[in-house]
Amino acid sequence: MFARKQSGAAPFGAMPVPDQPPSASEKNSSLSPGLNTSNGDGSETETTSAILASVKEQELQFERLTRELEAERQIVASQLERCKLGSETGSMSSISSAGEQFHWQTQDGQKDIEDELTTGLELVDSCIRSLQESGILDPQDYSTSERPSLLSQSALQLNSKPEGSFQYPASYHSNQTLALGDTAPSQLPARSTQARAAGQSFSQGTTGRAGHLAGSEPAPPPPPPREPFAPSLGSAFHLPDAPPAAAALYYSSSTLPAPPRGGSPLTTTQGGSPTKLQRGGSAPEGAAYAAPRGSSPKQSPSRLAKSYSTSSPINIVVSSAGLSPIRVTSPPTVQSTISSSPIHQLSSTIGTYATLSPTKRLVHASEQYSKHSQELYATATLQRPGSLAAGSRASYSSQHGHLAPELRALQSPEHHIDPIYEDRVYQKPPMRSLSQSQGDPLPPAHTGTFRTSTAPSSPGVDSVPLQRTGSQHGPQNAAAATFQRASYAAGPASNYADPYRQLQYCASVDSPYSKSGPALPPEGTLARSPSIDSIQKDPREFGWRDPELPEVIQMLQHQFPSVQSNAAAYLQHLCFGDNKIKAEIRRQGGIQLLVDLLDHRMTEVHRSACGALRNLVYGKANDDNKIALKNCGGIPALVRLLRKTTDLEIRELVTGVLWNLSSCDALKMPIIQDALAVLTNAVIIPHSGWENSPLQDDRKIQLHSSQVLRNATGCLRNVSSAGEEARRRMRECDGLTDALLYVIQSALGSSEIDSKTVENCVCILRNLSYRLAAETSQGQHMGTDELDGLLCGETNGKDTESSGCWGKKKKKKKSQDQWDGVGPLPDCAEPPKGIQMLWHPSIVKPYLTLLSECSNPDTLEGAAGALQNLAAGSWKGWAEDVAGMAYALRSLPEGAPCLPQWSVYIRAAVRKEKGLPILVELLRIDNDRVVCAVATALRNMALDVRNKELIGKYAMRDLVHRLPGGNNSNNSGSKAMSDDTVTAVCCTLHEVITKNMENAKALRDAGGIEKLVGISKSKGDKHSPKVVKAASQVLNSMWQYRDLRSLYKKDGWSQYHFVASSSTIERDRQRPYSSSRTPSISPVRVSPNNRSASAPASPREMISLKERKTDYESAGNNATYHGTKGEHTSRKDTMTAQNTGVSTLYRNSYGAPAEDIKQNQVSTQPVPQEPSRKDYETYQPFPNSTRNYDESFFEDQVHHRPPASEYTMHLGLKSTGNYVDFYSAARPYSELNYETSHYPASPDSWV
């Protein structure tokens, strides 16, 4: 505060003023931060005149603003174009220049201004009426006709200066209004003087020091504080230890032009006339406002105060900066003082209606700017579109032109603005409460539309401008945290209300302008958008157009990383669910640019580029995009990024892109070649926990829940069906098989057993188990003893006692080679590792545990299919084909050891682990594909004599129940079974009754004949030919048991029912062999009573098979479900959709909040432009974006079934075509020949 002037002193070089009485002077100095001037007599008439002059000035200002509204709207549009994001220089300086004029009002704000003007006029009329009724104001001095010109002067004077600078209605010190007390009757004269000084400039950072500094007169020491004000100070003010060195900051008037720097803003005259206060430059002609002494009856200060406080609803804030239309807030401790301060009440309410810039610059010392510039910029540069750069720059240049260059640089808007195009999108720090920053609790808020509170002053507190503190305290009190608007120089801060903020800021409600906060408050509560980030604007204030697609693609090459990142994120948003946009992006070269960004140095750019690529390559309809990405070098670029990045989100995105790419058949081998090693070593092994097996259980579960692991296993699941070469490379990849099995084993007994990761691992192992004997060196090498037994054994076929399910073998070898499931495995000296784990019997237990505990149908199908593949045939020393056998004969040294019969061991291990009841129980599950896989697995298990007996005894009714037709109650449910499943059940029944009359009798007892006859006699399209012929084969085999024919006839069946379809089969049998056709089936040639399906072949048959080897190979390839020409067939997909409701195309959310990657299309990507669209499960390109990106559902087009070949039986030596070949939809039934059943071993079913 300023000390009282000495008697006769002439402040600022003006005429001397009479001395005030000590009491009045002391009160003035304690209550006013403005100039300590007074008219000597304290006349009430001058007070009234001052009030009237100020009110008229306000009305004139409002009137002028009303006239300029229309013109301003037209200019705003042109000014907004300068704020575009793609300015040539990329900086705020390119938006506009200081010489241009700016208008604030936009069309959206017109109605608010007009409402404010109307309300302001009503309140002014009420104030005038109160003055007239109290006798203070002469009715002739004011009339309603004068009202239109009365309000204009207090409004903003925009574009009134040739230099184009903004003139604000008051300096920010006008916020530091002091509360008047009822004990200060003589303060009104001084306040009237201050009211007329509203437009003066202050050349010092403090309100009251302007006069002293301009006149080079040192400021007297502040007087001691007064008691009455001490309680109301709270923690809002403190006395600095020393005046700040950089306090000489200049601020021009916000309402009127700046006066000459060396002159006095106020000139006080005497000499027979009332004291007259002139505003320097208050009008272009420099007119002065005089307040005649006799303009109204003389009133006492107390009467004046009473009349204002009781009759007028208007609150006036009078401060050292004049009548300022700025609402201010103070701690509630001064609330009682405010209610008794009439002048405060009047001007503060009028100020509420005025339109002013929300740009409250916070000026600090240079060291504080360097420390808090970002925070200041976030809260201080809240301005209108036109003022984004040029207005604030012009105001600074006019207001701070006298500063030193270093200080001027600190004041410049460019000093505050964080680079828009740098590494990140700017986020405003939250506002902080002053009282909290000082350690005091925030006082409760006071509600009310026109709530006005002021920060009290004290004679003992120097009225230097308040400073925003740099405190980083926690969130504000939810009850009443108001925004701070600190003043310019160093010193304490107080709480001020944001003039454009009606709501209280609290921890539970984020800022309406926050990029990631909740929805915006209602329209009525917000009038301005304070955002200075040109990337995102308040949609109510700024009508930005969406950029065109070529513009967005061009921005991918921008020099600033943040522009590239935002452009990629916007592309991700645009192509969400829109295949046309995806194709257009490809045509315009967007994929190449996005791939180039994968090698960028900025992590944020990687994140956005991967998100966009993931959406672009999602879906089978976008295979062209996938191939384009591959042609652009995208797969190696993704692998490089995966290898070097440590960001978990980016790793998830990269593996998600690879998962989507892997659904394209043409890209499976390129992914195997470029990404298999990195996926295994950088993702699968580390995230599985296999290398660190002693991990804690919770750690294991966390790893198995990893999105990165899920994506990587999904990718490998797809590529594992790419053919023999792909399977070979994956089997030989060190650590892959071990890690996949470890994931499965560690998930057993936990909730993770149904997870997508476990499902993927099981499906990979199932595919790798396909054709294991033929595609591994172990299956292609055999001992000479086994070959001798195969080729030189007894050929008469009469020694049926020595033949069994595994074919004819030498008696001396039988005991050595077979394992009954009890005791240790023969020929197993060391524990299995690597590829050996695929076929070792120890793998049976994890598979069976999955089958008994898991509820995921895809996992169940995968585990059953893996057992089916492993149990197919006896491939221990047998070659898959004649070529392999011949190779073995030539390459194996004499006396080479034979390999164990792993398929025999697998079947025995399933029985030992009580797996047969588990498989039979799954026949009852209501899932077509699971039933199909389980039925085929049971068929392969029945190759074991003991298993066949158990299945015939305990599973026959379940198998028959799955056949369509008959009178069973679930007939409708059975009809829903697919042809593949019905065929699998028929093949299982055929294997079970082969060479087992008891099982054939059990089939008759279970009512199977009726259903089988119904299928074989069906006409039309009720059943496919494949199903009809499979059922006929079972009936033909049953008729071979002569002992059971009497029972059949007793039940009313005749030979016609059993062999009615044999004529067709006979024709196929009699058809000569050709190089283009495989042998057909003839159930008549060999009776199942005399010949087992797994009986050994004679040398003659071996030679004939050698000639047909090539035919089997080609037929098998054509029949494969996962063939080189495509892994999904429309038939298979249709079957899946109709019968299980589950598509082979899995859409996994990627990190999105929904399963679209949403398991989230994860919303991902939300884009600020469309906040309502929630997509990017997971991932927000912008701080406020909802994640709605197309988070491409990773299409697990992993054939839930092993590759086509997996389901196709292994043809060749061990194929019993009568079972296996039925599974091939591509091969006509007539091409199958029953002769193949004579060869030992049983092929894998194709399921």
From Swiss-Prot:
Keywords: Cell adhesion, Cell junction, Cell projection, Coiled coil, Developmental protein, Glycoprotein, Methylation, Nucleus, Phosphoprotein, Repeat, Transcription, Transcription regulation. SMART domains: ARM. This is Catenin delta-2. The modification Phosphoserine is found at S7, S264, S273, S324, S357, S412, S458, S511, S1087, S1098. ARM repeats lie at residues 391-433, 537-576, 579-618, 623-663, 679-721, 725-770, 832-872, 904-943, 997-1040. The modification Omega-N-methylarginine is found at R209, R261, R279, R293. Residues 49-84 form a coiled coil. It comes from Mus musculus. It is found in: Nucleus; Cell junction, Adherens junction; Cell projection, Dendrite; Perikaryon. Residues 22-50, 172-207, 265-276, 296-309, 466-475, 1072-1081 have a biased composition (Polar residues). It holds the Pfam family Arm. Belongs to the beta-catenin family. Residues 218-228 have a biased composition (Pro residues). Residues 1-50, 134-238, 256-309, 429-480, 514-533, 1064-1131, 1152-1176 are annotated as: Disordered. Expressed in neurons and glial cells. Isoform 2 was found to be the most predominant isoform in various brain regions. Expressed at neuromuscular junctions. Residues 1103-1112 have a biased composition (Basic and acidic residues). Induction: By retinoic acid. GO terms for cellular component: adherens junction; dendrite; nucleus; perikaryon; postsynaptic density. One of its GO terms (biological process) is learning. Residues 149-160, 1087-1100 have a biased composition (Low complexity). O-glycosylated. Has a critical role in neuronal development, particularly in the formation and/or maintenance of dendritic spines and synapses. Involved in the regulation of canonical Wnt signaling. It probably acts on beta-catenin turnover, facilitating beta-catenin interaction with GSK3B, phosphorylation, ubiquitination and degradation. May be involved in neuronal cell adhesion and tissue morphogenesis and integrity by regulating adhesion molecules. Functions as a transcriptional activator when bound to ZBTB33. Binds to E-cadherin at a juxtamembrane site within the cytoplasmic domain. Binds to PSEN1. Interacts with PDZD2. Interacts (via the extreme C-terminus) with FRMPD2 (via the PDZ 2 domain). Interacts with ZBTB33. Interacts with ARHGEF28. Interacts with CDK5. Interacts with CTNNB1. Interacts with GSK3A and GSK3B. Interacts with DNM2. Interacts with CCDC85B. Its main location: nucleus.
